[in-house]
UniProtKB/Swiss-Prot annotation:
<keyword id="KW-0800">Toxin</keyword>
<keyword id="KW-0964">Secreted</keyword>
<dbReference type="InterPro" id="IPR003571">
    <property type="entry name" value="Snake_3FTx"/>
</dbReference>
<dbReference type="GO" id="GO:0090729">
    <property type="term" value="F:toxin activity"/>
</dbReference>
<keyword id="KW-0528">Neurotoxin</keyword>
<dbReference type="GO" id="GO:0005576">
    <property type="term" value="C:extracellular region"/>
</dbReference>
<keyword id="KW-1015">Disulfide bond</keyword>
<keyword id="KW-0008">Acetylcholine receptor inhibiting toxin</keyword>
<dbReference type="Pfam" id="PF21947">
    <property type="entry name" value="Toxin_cobra-type"/>
</dbReference>
<feature type="disulfide bond">
    <location>
        <begin position="17"/>
        <end position="40"/>
    </location>
</feature>
<comment type="function">
    <text>Binds to muscle nicotinic acetylcholine receptor (nAChR) and inhibit acetylcholine from binding to the receptor, thereby impairing neuromuscular transmission.</text>
</comment>
<dbReference type="InterPro" id="IPR018354">
    <property type="entry name" value="Snake_toxin_con_site"/>
</dbReference>
<feature type="disulfide bond">
    <location>
        <begin position="3"/>
        <end position="23"/>
    </location>
</feature>
<keyword id="KW-0629">Postsynaptic neurotoxin</keyword>
<dbReference type="GO" id="GO:0030550">
    <property type="term" value="F:acetylcholine receptor inhibitor activity"/>
</dbReference>
<keyword id="KW-0872">Ion channel impairing toxin</keyword>
<dbReference type="GO" id="GO:0099106">
    <property type="term" value="F:ion channel regulator activity"/>
</dbReference>
Amino acid sequence: MICHNQQSSQPPTIKTCPGETNCYKKRWRDHRGTIIERGCGCPSVKKGVGIYCCKTNKCNR
């Protein structure tokens, strides 16, 4: 699986994730504004954090 792994407004970067079948994009707000985190897998999240998990290469743009 190949997933995007940059945070928020950083330039796009990708990561190869051997053995993974998902990519994710998490979104939440704090004192800095809206934070977006991307990576491999499909982690569980705390209340108030949005999560999008997908199953194709680079699907978490």
